[in-house]
Every structure is written in structure tokens, then in C-alpha cells.
Amino acid sequence: MAFNFNWSPLMADAGFYTRAQELLTAALNKSPKPPIIVDDIVVTELNLGSNPPELEILEIGDLAEDRFRGIFKMSYAGDAFLTLKTCVQANPLNTYLLTRHPFTSPQPLAAATGLTIPLQITLSDIKLSGFVILVFSKQKGITVVFRNDPLESLKVSSTFDSIPFVRDYLQKEIEGQLRILFMDELPAIIHRLSLRLWGTEYSELETTSAQVTNPSLDGPGLDPLLNPPQDPVDASGNVLSISEIASLSLDSGVEMHSLFSRKNVLRLAALTDSQRTLSLFTPSIREVVFRAWTGSMEQADGPSGLVSPMSPPLSRTHSHIATSSLSLQDAASLASSSHSRPTPPSSGFSGYGLSMGAGRHSKAHARKRKKRVVDLRRRPKSADDMESVSGESAYTETSTTTSAVSVFSGSTIPEENNDDPVTPPVSPQRTIRRPTLRDRIAARDDAERNSRRGIPAEFGHDLPTVRTSPPIANDMARIITSASNLQRQLQQQQPADSKPLPSLQETAPIRTLRPSPSSTPQYPTEKPNASNNYTSSSSPSARDPQQQQPQQLSRPSSSFIMESAQNGGILEQAWMMKMASEIARRIQDEKMGGEDPTNSSSRGGSGGGFWERPSMRSHTPPPAYRH
């Protein structure tokens, strides 16, 4: 079974084509257009042609006087055509940048300038073939649904037919858009057209909606801003009187829309200020923490209690400005109480930092800071006062050798704190006597040698160091203990009428940086018979063969330097250590005078005969190469 369409009435009705063009234009502009199309698509010409489509009935589901439902096979190869007009973007770089995020685009200046070209497209030689479900009803109109894609071929003629690339691109894009049109938009267009033809109620409803959307049909509209508000203000916020409002008109040049209600203006201003400054006008929001709050009730929450005028505290997060917590009173109390836990010195250099708390009550749950203090003050009473206190442990550094004399009882060399404004210098505890002529001559020779070369590594080139390693401290204590025992044996072997040898402290002279006649240091006076026992190196008969064991000489222990550092600086310490080594060297030379100097040098270490015997000098690297 087939149908014969009467195609002539559709071609003769001019209103039908007008309504069809409007519906097609709305349908083409409804979906999002590609970025190359920069203007609306307008249908300028529409002609269905003289050849009607062919329908073949496959199934009839319902048949009555006012309704029909069936499935058809449709074929169309007529002379219908459609003409469209739009504007396209001819610059592909501009089109590319429009589809990309501005953050990732190179932002060219001249190359991205748009070039808009008008475009006219004509669609002809349309060939359709597909299965159609047709439902007809006088009350509901005609509904046409395509079960498959009906478009087989299409010819596209445009302004850019001379450019093959553009022609192929337009052909591909338009075919894709028409396939969407036939499957989605064309059934809705046909349904609306059928309602206009057979449904009078629909036509009246459509006319009413058109009048609402187009107010020009009912005459000129009313200006909603013509009537001023009850409390009008101008653009500057000044309240206007009734006479000033009456003098205003739409033709006087004064804009009537500047008259707003004063209450509304205040609300808008408060809303704007709240977004800028987070002020009190901000409406309260649940479960939201304010980032700033400058009220007086919150300023006392900081632990320091001090507020800088340039940076007020952020009390909502319990921020406060950290101040220097170490003052002169703290330092005085620190010096007075030596056994108490001192304040950490680092707190005085903390600066003005911003410490943030976790919440409003973060101080109660704050984590305790570790207090790590190193006390380097001199304790003349005992060596146990040199303590290093940490947050969890404390340890005491004592002498590594308990059998040594009391002069060498420490293993650390503290730096002399000359910049301490609180702790006074400790006065010397022993009487200083005038040096002998021999000591002054030796001091002058040593000064000349020190002017030619620096103090070697054996005599304290690392004096400023704070700590001495335990092996070096053990060697020094052992050397000084051996020297003391040797001196004690020599005193026992002397006759009863001879005077005893001076102690190691008395023979070590001390000199100041700037000697003056009034404050010249006094040294112990030595007699020839007492000094010959350890200064002369030419009488082999005075030596005991049982005491010819080599003594390794090194610099003295650090506590001896600490005790003698009360009277001077680094030069005094170097001098004292050199003299102690010289005394030990002379005692060794007295015992080892008959032996080979080279062998004695190898056994005696680096301290024997350094200044007088160059052949016995040990091959110790310079101070710069020992670290």
C-alpha cells in the first residue's frame, strides 16, 4: 500500500514557509554552535520543491476518523533547498584561543585579531531514506519519529567553495548538524506546525504568550523607576526633599534611576564593606571561624600581654607577638643561682615572631618546649659545676684522671666570656712574686721566637676551642702526673740543707698583656742550687739511671688553663702552657742527657727541645692542617 501526496497546497501557502523559517532558525540557534561561527544562523530561503517524498506502509497500529498510527518507510530525492546566512571567524588562531583557558594561552596581540567574514550556505540535493513512525491526532497534531538516521547525502554550496579545505570542512560540519536536526529537532518542528494548523486552542495560547514577551503590542510600557521611593537619596547618599524630587523629570538630564531608598543603600554599603574588611556587619555563619577580630575583649588572650600597634593580635586563632623574655634582671638571677635551671639563652634572640595557636583554648594543651642550656661559666670551687642541662637529662663533665694533681682536674676549656656585663672577673687566688733574671731572659728569647713564627700546634693553637677530646686530656694528665712524681723524687734525693724544688705552679710565670710599673707581676725567687737540678743539662753525674724513662710531653690539661685564665687572655694561657712544657723538657733533658737526641726526640714527643734543638723537632703538621 502506498500514498499519493498532494504537494501543491504546501507550495502555494506563503504563511507556511514563513512559520517554517522561524522554527528552523530557532532550532538551529538552540544548540551550542562551534566556535568558528560567531553570529546567529538565519534561514533566508526555504522551498520544499515539486517532488513529494515516497512512503511505504509497513505496519498500521491504530486507525480511526480522528487518529492514526503507523510505521512507514520514507524515501526522498526531490529538489528542495535551504539557504542559511551567518558570520564566521576566518582567523584560526583567534578561534583556538577562544576555546582555551586564558592562563595557558600565549596571549598574542596582533596575531589573535579576529576577522569576521559573512557566509551564505545553500543546502540542496537532499536524499533521505529511513523508517518513520507517524502518529496523527486532531487534538495532539502530527508526531513524526525517525528510527534511524535518514540523511544519505547532501550538497553544500557556500562562499568558500573556491578553497577546498574550507569547503570540505563546511560539508562535514553541516552534515553532522543536519543529522542532529533530523533526529531531535525536526519532530518537534513538525509537531508545532501541526498544532497551528488543526489546534485553535494552541494558536490562541501562542498569541497570548507572544503578547507577554513583546510588550510593544499593548502600547508603551511603564517606567518602574518613575515613582521615587519613600526616602530617596541621590548618587552621593544625600537625602532629597519633596521639592527637589518634583523638580526632577526624565527630560531634565538628571537620571531618575539614581534615586534609591536610603535603607537599601545602607544595606548594600554594609554588604560591600563586609566583603572588603570582614567587619562586624558580616552576618554570623555557623561553623565558621573569623580570620580577624580586633575587639578589646580579645586583646588580653595573648600570653605576652604586649600588643604592637602595627600588628594587632589575631585572637580568633590565638596569635600573639613573641617578645624578648631575657632581661638584665633575668641575667642577674641567672648568675646568682648557679644550681637552678637557667633560662634558655635562645629565648633572648627569638625576635618578634607570630606564634599561632590551634584554637581558642590552645594554651592549656600546648606542647612543652624543650629547654636546652649549656652553662659555660667558670666555677672556681669545684669542677662539678660545669653542667650541660637539657630538657630530659643532665650530665656532668669531670676530670678524666683522678690521680692527677688538683691543678689539672678538668677536661673542658671554657671560653673566656669578656662580654658578660653581670659576672665580675675573678681575682687571682695566689701571691705573685717578682721574676728572676733568668726568667726574664727566657721570656725575651721566647718573645723573639714567637715574633718570627706562630705558636705551634704543640703549644695551644686551638686555645679558643671549648672542649678537649678525652684522649688528649688523658695524655696531658698523665704527662703532668709523671712530671710531678719526678719532681717529688728529685726533692727526696736532695741533701737536707738544700731547698726543695718549686712547684709547677710557681715556676710557670704569668705575664699580662700590658704590664705597667705599678702592676708588674711578681714571680718566685729561685736560688741556683734549687734551679740547677732541673735547668742544667751538662752534668751527667747528677742524673739517676733508674729515672731515665722517656716522658711524653704535651700541653697541660684544660683546668690548669681555666684556673690561670683568670689573670689574662689567650696570650697568658699560651705562655703558661709553654713554660710548663719547658720545665718538663728540662727535667727530661736532665734525665736523658746521655742518650741520643734523635732517640730522645722520638720518645719524648713533640714537647722536648723544640726551641733549642731543631733536630729533635717532631714532624707535626702546621696548625692549619690539623683540623
Swiss-Prot record:
Low complexity: bias regions: 215-225, 332-341, 390-412, 528-557
InterPro entries on file: Mdm34, SMP_LBD
GO function terms (MF aspect): lipid binding
Subcellular location: Mitochondrion outer membrane
Membrane topology: Multi-pass membrane protein
Positions of the SMP-LTD domain: 1-195
Region of interest: Disordered: 209-230, 332-470, 486-557, 586-627
Ranges of biased composition (kind: Basic residues): 360-372
Keyword Zinc among record annotations: no
Biased composition range(s): Basic and acidic residues: 373-384, 436-451
Record-level GO cellular component terms: ERMES complex
UniProt-listed GO biological process terms: mitochondrial genome maintenance; mitochondrion-endoplasmic reticulum membrane tethering; phospholipid transport
Coiled-coil residue windows: none
Swiss-Prot/TrEMBL keywords: Lipid transport, Lipid-binding, Membrane, Mitochondrion, Mitochondrion outer membrane, Transmembrane, Transmembrane beta strand, Transport
Family: Belongs to the MDM34 family.
Complex formation: Component of the ER-mitochondria encounter structure (ERMES) or MDM complex, composed of MMM1, MDM10, MDM12 and MDM34.
Role: Component of the ERMES/MDM complex, which serves as a molecular tether to connect the endoplasmic reticulum (ER) and mitochondria. Components of this complex are involved in the control of mitochondrial shape and protein biogenesis, and function in nonvesicular lipid trafficking between the ER and mitochondria. MDM34 is required for the interaction of the ER-resident membrane protein MMM1 and the outer mitochondrial membrane-resident beta-barrel protein MDM10.
Domain notes from UniProt: Lacks alpha-helical transmembrane segments, suggesting that it resides in the membrane via beta-sheet conformations similar to those predicted for other outer membrane proteins and porin. The SMP-LTD domain is a barrel-like domain that can bind various types of glycerophospholipids in its interior and mediate their transfer between two adjacent bilayers.
Protein name: Mitochondrial distribution and morphology protein 34
Source organism per UniProt: Blastomyces gilchristii (strain SLH14081)
